[in-house]
Design a protein with these regions (language model features):
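Bacterial N-terminal signal peptides
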Residues: 2-12
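Function-determining sites in protein domains
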Residues: 16-169
Length: 169
């Protein structure tokens, strides 16, 4: 009976265990990239924790920072420009082995110099993985990207695209 209870608890509370894990890797994939971009620098990764932002608080906790994860939570978007390059941004953590824990989509508009982040909705790929990790409550919605994320992602994407075209950065 005790072993059944232990197994039940292990299956019922994985998100609580994940919450202690730091982001160990971020990958950026896009059709215009020659290869996925991989971010592994611990100082950079420390800025982009999946377990921050909307939907991660508790009753006695202070409200989440308006800018965290890779999102500016204060700027939800009803719509965003169309025809932009879409990048799949994947977050990994070591729990205890490295595994995929969360996926969002990032698009950048060079005309306005703004980036946008999309959280997959209920009927879309990655929704189930995401809500099993953490339910932000904003699934299926767009937000403006956080400037700290823009400062990391845009140069990496531009550099990868320059290499693909055969030019040097």
């Amino acid at each position: 009976m005790l072993s059944v209870l232990v197994i039940f608890l292990l299956l019922a509370i994985p998100a609580e265990l994940f919450a202690k894990a730091e982001t160990s890797k971020i990958t950026i994939k896009g059709t215009d990239l020659s290869a996925p971009i991989e971010i592994r620098d611990p100082k950079t990764l420390a800025n982009f924790a999946v377990w921050t932002g909307t939907g991660t608080g508790c009753t006695p906790c202070p409200p989440p920072s308006p800018e965290s994860f890779i999102v500016d939570w204060s700027q939800p978007m009803a719509d965003h420009p169309t025809g932009l390059h879409r990048y799949e941004v994947s977050f990994y953590a070591k729990i205890p082995d490295e595994r995929l824990i969360y996926v969002v989509f990032y698009e950048y508009d060079p005309a306005t110099e703004h980036g946008y982040v999309y959280f997959p909705g209920r009927t879309e790929e990655w929704y189930r993985l995401n809500v099993n990790t953490i339910f932000h409550g904003v699934e299926g919605k767009w937000f403006r990207a956080w400037s700290a994320w823009e400062g990391v992602a845009r140069p990496l994407i531009a550099g990868s695209n320059a290499l693909r075209r055969g030019t040097r950065c």
